[in-house]
Amino acid sequence: MMEHAEHSPAAIREKAAGAVNCQSVTLPSGLTVLCRTMPGYSSVHAMYATNFGSVVREFTLNGKRIQLPAGTAHFLEHKMFESEQGDAFDLYAKTGAAANAFTSYDRTCYIFTATGMTDENLDILLNMVGHPWFTKETIAKEQGIIGQEIKMYDDSPDWRLLTALFRCLYKSHPIRDDIAGTTQSIAELTPELLYACTDAFYRPGNMVLSVAGNITLDQAVEACRRNGVYDAVEPPQVETIFPQEADTVQHKAVSYTHL
């Protein structure tokens, strides 16, 4: 079937951007910056996202093959808030911003909402994600925290049923595994593995900074310039690897009893 130009993905994105008056620019570093300035609004919403989620379990980085345990992307999301200087949540508390993050199957996103100190909050966000810091000690501490989160989701019938459904549909694809992994899988993580992930996927060309509210595109771009993600850099050679999936479902039925 031929694809009409007005129905192409690029045309649809352009139409959607025009409908919400969204500006966009790709920086020399490869980072995409999206901005929707909203006159009359007091707050600013920002999201810094990478194309790296739970289904990425194997990749090559500059020719070296790397395998990840289940839950790596989610674990990394937690660790990005911590640096040698302290916890990013403490910095956000001083500016009055509300911050959070989430991991999906194919994305990891870091967000904040604030009504003031926009430049300072953007600096916290970009610096936090741009300067990862991992040690064996901090990883061990986080393993205990995330282990409790995993147990919490184990008590959710909806989440367990969704996971069971994916295990029915897929034989090998990593979507079969819980986004957070298991207590056993995250115990395999090391600083070297996490740094390999940030080198491969937390690079400007694989990320998007999206802002909206009482902010301009120039402000967002200037924040990128201040925090070292504006200028062109030589990207690493990265190839994501997925297992060959069967044409038939793994199982035809699933049942789950929650007591």
Regions found by a protein language model. Name each.
Residues 2-4, 84-197, 218, 243-244:
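Acidic/histidine-enriched segments that form metal/cofactor-coordinating
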